[in-house]
Amino acid sequence: MPRVKSNVVRLKRKKQILKHAKGAFGGRSKLWKAAKETVERGWRYAYRDRKNKKRDFRRLWIVRINAAARLHDMSYNAFINGLHASGIEVDRKVLADLAVREPEAFAAIAEQAKKALDAKVAAA
């Protein structure tokens, strides 16, 4: 089997890792082993936090919707239940945005949800 020299490939890989490590403190941006560990750890955190970001934003939207719904004398749970009962299909991201940027539109949606909830309770 012929001998394989990996000089070009190895240097290219090292260059990429050191490029990603730029901005790290001290030897973490200069020394190969430390830089490699730093970059790989950073990639692990980035992968994990891309998943956590979705959870965090959903939690933020729910907090905002809850606060806005309570201004209209409804809990978050009752508000969402009323939305389903009235057939309004708006996701939490849009609802949270409406609650912050357009309170009048959110108030109209909350009123419809409240009516649908009252009708649902009266029917039961």
From Swiss-Prot:
One of its GO terms (cellular component) is ribonucleoprotein complex. It comes from the Bacteria. InterPro entries: Ribosomal_bL20, RIBOSOMAL_L20_CS, Ribosomal_protein_bL20_C. Keywords: Ribonucleoprotein, Ribosomal protein, RNA-binding, rRNA-binding. Disulfide bonds: none annotated. One of its GO terms (molecular function) is rRNA binding. Pfam families: Ribosomal_L20. GO terms for biological process: ribosomal large subunit assembly; translation. Belongs to the bacterial ribosomal protein bL20 family. Binds directly to 23S ribosomal RNA and is necessary for the in vitro assembly process of the 50S ribosomal subunit. It is not involved in the protein synthesizing functions of that subunit. This is Large ribosomal subunit protein bL20. It comes from Gemmatimonas aurantiaca (strain DSM 14586 / JCM 11422 / NBRC 100505 / T-27). The lineage of its organism: Bacteria, Pseudomonadati, Gemmatimonadota, Gemmatimonadia, Gemmatimonadales.
